[in-house]
A protein has these predicted regions:
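Aromatic-rich, lipid-facing transmembrane alpha helices and their immediate juxtamembrane interface loops
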Residues: 1-232
Length: 232
């Protein structure tokens, strides 16, 4: 499916002479996969060692020991699908209900949808033994094969609300606020501007995702966590 999205991105870019949101999210999310393993360390996530592993990244301090090969691709396709859909929905509702702010619409829509999906997927994955949380802090879902803390899906939902709110706002020329602030809107149309848009999306995605999800998990473990046999 990741490859299909690459083809879709190429075709849409060729047609419109402009990178679509799907493609920007695909590139930004795929390039951000490395954050997964630092966040897993903070959240005490232990992956099933039966998964095929990344060939170039073994054990490393402050990361979970098992690093599945599919993570870059799963990050890419999931965010390339979910974020544009939510942005489209929030933008459409914003036109229907102009008195409601984009931030509130995003919080009311993106947060609960992302939260519900994460709880469902992670809960079923933990139940299937794909991964588990060796140490759990706060309320959690309990299964025969593992536990799922609820704080991390909630943080991801908050990030989604923030990120969608940022992307649901465009100026009359179709540029997002972060592109305007970075001076991209002033650049002439062409591949140089599109390359700048890629880097801008990567920065927005990686910085915001790290602050909301990865840094908070790592800081929480460093301050309040304890030892772990599965995720030392």
């Amino acid at each position: 499916f990741w490859c299909v999205l690459v083809v879709v991105t190429i075709l849409l870019t060729w047609k419109n002479k402009r990178l679509p949101l799907v493609g920007l999210c695909l590139i930004a999310a795929t390039s951000s996969f490395w954050q997964e393993f630092f966040g897993d360390w903070g959240a005490y996530v232990a992956w099933n060692p039966a998964f095929a592993k990344l060939p170039f990244w073994g054990e490393m301090p402050f990361t979970t020991p098992v690093k599945p090969l599919f993570i870059p691709f799963s990050w890419g396709w999931w965010f390339a699908v979910s974020i544009p859909l939510l942005v489209t929905l929030v933008s459409w509702l914003g036109q229907k209900f102009p008195k409601l702010s984009t931030n509130w619409l995003s919080l009311l829509i993106a947060f609960p949808l992302f939260l519900a999906y994460q709880i469902y997927v992670e809960g079923s994955s933990v139940a299937n033994g794909w991964w588990t949380y060796d140490v759990v802090i706060g309320p959690a879902l309990q299964t025969e094969k593992g536990r799922l803390p609820l704080i991390f899906p909630a943080l991801l939902g908050l990030w989604a609300a923030y990120f969608v709110a940022k992307l649901a706002k465009r100026d009359t020329d179709g540029f997002w606020p972060h592109e305007v602030k970075m001076g991209i809107a002033a650049k002439p149309a062409g591949w140089r501007r599109e390359l700048a848009r890629i880097w801008a999306m990567i920065v927005l995605f990686q910085v915001s995702f790290f602050i909301f999800n990865i840094g908070s998990a790592m800081l929480g473990r460093a301050l309040f966590g304890g030892p772990s046999l599965l995720v030392p």
